Design a protein with these regions (language model features):
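Aromatic- and carboxylate-enriched substrate-binding clefts and catalytic-loop regions
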Residues: 341-510
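N-terminal accessory beta-strand-rich subdomains and adjacent acidic, glycine-rich linkers
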Residues: 22-282
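C-terminal beta-strand-rich structural cap/linker in extracellular carbohydrate-active enzymes
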Residues: 624-648
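Bacterial N-terminal signal peptides
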Residues: 8-15
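Edge strands and adjacent loops of beta-rich recognition modules
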Residues: 94-100, 544-568
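An acidic-aromatic substrate-binding cleft motif
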Residues: 252, 256-330, 334
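Carbohydrate-binding surface patches
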Residues: 561-599, 643-644
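Catalytic cores of secreted or luminal carbohydrate-active enzymes
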Residues: 512, 516-558
Length: 648
């Protein structure tokens, strides 16, 4: 009798366990290497495998709306699997003219009008929430995003203790095991490395009417999400800032009740996979501008960094028409498409219509038109917000684009500001470049008159911009979209010798390094930061820089090690450009690079570090050689060095 009772008890226990066991749904990438396991039980959580390696473990997903929370014992209604197989042709292609979008998708629907899409790509994963609440508006109080790792991973992050910042922090490199709950938060993108060396790049795309995500350590070998609240009221602060006077209790207020939230994505693979990915592109929405023929990416001579410093002329240089006509002349000589009038061209930052006495914008636009050079204007975001009529005013004058600066926030209101301004500029065929900005997150794909974003510790910071930090950019910031780094210093120095001042700036790294940045870094609007006079005196270097396209048909990552070196080849038409950079290292870098991507023989013109560039950074050597698809190039880079060339 006791045995029978024991048997009954055991059967009942196993039955309860079976009832309590979570349901697991799995989806794999087209090549089968990436696998997502979604567990639906008391919580909704997912894990990710790269082959047999677990890279993300039990990440819990929640969504807190007003008077409703999703994620506690979610009740699955349906599971639909589909295949994504399409090609995307970006209007402003940063790496590829044709981008394949191939993935397997699993769409889960739950009771309560909530769904989650999961996508498995050959090079990573993505997911997003779907809300189906009908016509009513929804307040999102919080979205729960987790990144949990099965072991200590190296984290490469940008720490911040405030949401009000321009995303220009240096990278910190630390094990997840050393991070404690309550430590500073980090903004995206963020890069992780597993004990096996697998890289995981985390970011987001298709962010609309919603804040950007920040992450904070959870003290358990991982991160959890944290978002800026949605502003309810604010007031101006000075000529370029704002003070949020009242915040709502939610991160996203009054959003459509039938919509998708942003894609969260993780690119997974080796260093080359990370640097070559197009995840932000394929997850963004399609282009929303019918006629894009007027959108012309290009290079621009920039005035602010070199402090309007030109010499050997018969006029007083500064912020005046004579200086800008000189800049236009130099731009025209080298085939640079644009010049920029940065801060200082108007009498007051607050007044976009009254120029200083020495500036006549219409005269400069007309002069530039004769020379084949377009004009861009710098403006504070606050000025644009208060004077939206400046957009048709300067468009009618013939200005080509606006550099809009100092947003320094990524809450719901500011995300909407970006889109509102870019849409308004598109109506009048004006292009846009955002400085003091957050990272790309899809808007530039939908509205491609947005050519670039800053959101990077770039050359603007002079000695604060060191190659040891910048060598991470192809694997982090520039791996998620256009990056206005503002390269091009001709006064070059190794970091210990970088004594540049505001009026006589210097650039860290060798001359060949600064030149190679034009091939290695990607931006629809690429600055030439140094003095036009220096570019004239360094004409053979300038001729190469000005020949580098800002958009590309194809990209090949030839050699890559995050934090150490990056070598890339990019094709425009029938020409291949090759760029290589390295950071601070104890020994020179020697690499053998195959040119097997060539389809026919050609002539290579190249620039490399000079014999003494490890000490005297301006030292470089120019060379030429015949090459074929069988050629093996020998690259030699000094510390903080570079190599660049073009095959014609």
């Amino acid at each position: 009798m006791k045995q029978k009772l024991l048997l009954v008890a055991l059967l009942a226990a196993f039955g309860l366990l079976a009832m309590a066991a979570p349901r697991v749904e799995t989806i794999s990438s087209p090549n089968g290497n990436i696998r997502i396991e979604v567990s639906i039980g008391n919580q909704l959580q997912y894990s990710v495998y790269n082959g047999d390696e677990l890279v993300l473990k039990n990440n819990v997903l929640t969504l807190q709306m007003r008077n409703e929370r999703f994620g506690d014992k979610p009740q699955l209604k349906g599971c639909k699997r589909s295949r994504i197989d399409e090609v995307i042709r970006p209007v402003v292609p940063m790496k590829y003219a044709v981008v394949p979008n191939k993935a397997n998708q699993m769409s889960l629907t739950f009771k309560g009008g909530i769904g989650v899409d999961f996508r498995a790509y050959d090079n990573g994963i993505a997911y997003r929430f779907n809300i189906n609440k009908g016509k009513k508006k929804v307040d999102v109080l919080d979205e729960g995003v987790e990144l949990n790792f099965p072991a200590p991973f190296m984290a490469h992050i940008s720490k911040t203790d405030t949401y009000a910042m321009s995303c220009e922090k240096p990278y910190t490199h630390i094990s997840t095991s050393e991070l404690q709950e309550g430590d500073q938060m980090t903004y995206l993108p963020i890069l992780f490395e597993s004990p096996r060396g697998t890289k995981v790049l985390f970011s987001e795309s298709d962010v609309r009417d919603y804040p950007h995500i920040f992450l904070t350590p959870n003290g358990k070998n991982g991160f959890t999400s944290i978002f800026p609240k949605s502003p309810e009221t604010w007031e101006p602060s000075g000529d370029r800032g704002w003070k949020i006077t009242k915040e709502r209790d939610c991160i996203a207020a009054q959003i459509d009740g039938r919509r998708s939230l942003p894609w969260r994505f993780a690119v997974i693979g080796d260093d080359a996979t990370i640097a070559g990915n197009q995840m932000e592109v394929v997850l963004a929405g399609p282009c929303e501008i019918d006629d894009v023929s007027w959108i012309k990416p290009g290079q621009v001579n920039w005035d602010w960094w070199n402090h309007w410093t030109v010499w050997g002329v018969d006029f007083e240089t500064g912020i005046n028409n004579d200086t800008y006509k000189y800049i236009i002349d130099v731009a025209s000589k080298f085939g640079v498409e644009y010049i920029l009038l940065d801060e200082g061209w108007n009498k007051s930052v607050k007044d976009p219509f009254t120029t200083r006495d020495e500036i006549n914008v219409q005269e400069l636009v007309d002069y530039g038109r004769q020379k084949g050079v377009g004009v861009w204007l710098w403006l504070s975001w606050l000025t644009v917000e208060h004077h939206m009529d400046l957009i048709p005013y300067y468009a009618k004058m013939g200005v080509k684009g606006l550099k809009i600066d100092f947003m320094d926030h990524s809450n719901q209101w500011m995300v909407n500001y970006y889109e509102r301004i870019v849409r308004e500029c598109a109506k009048y065929k004006l292009m846009v470049d955002f400085h003091g900005a957050f990272k790309p997150s899809g808007l530039e794909q939908r509205l491609p008159n947005l050519l670039s974003y800053e959101g990077v510790l770039g050359l603007e910071q002079c000695a604060g911009c060191e190659p040891k930090n910048s060598i991470w950019l192809p694997f982090m910031r520039n791996a998620v979209g256009a990056m206005d780094f503002t390269p091009g210093a001709m006064q070059n120095a190794q970091p210990e010798d970088n004594w540049g001042t505001g009026s006589l700036p210097m650039g860290g790294g060798t001359r060949a390094y600064q030149m190679a940045l034009y091939v290695c870094f990607e931006s629809g609007l690429q600055m030439l930061a140094d003095s036009p006079t220096r570019y004239l005196r360094e004409a053979e270097c300038t001729e190469f820089i000005a020949s580098v396209p800002t958009t590309w048909d194809d990209t090949r990552i030839l050699a890559a090690k995050a934090g150490d070196y990056y070598v890339v080849a990019k094709r425009k038409g029938e020409q291949w450009f090759i760029g290589a950079i390295t950071g601070e290292r104890k020994q020179p870098l020697d690499l053998t690079i195959s040119l097997d991507f060539l389809t026919k023989p050609g002539q290579l013109t190249y620039f490399q570090d000079g014999r003494n560039a490890h000490r005297i950074a301006v030292d470089y050597k120019k060379g030429e050689q015949a090459v074929t698809p069988q050629t093996k190039l020998q690259l030699h880079l000094v510390r903080n060095g570079g190599w660049c060339g073009v095959v014609k």
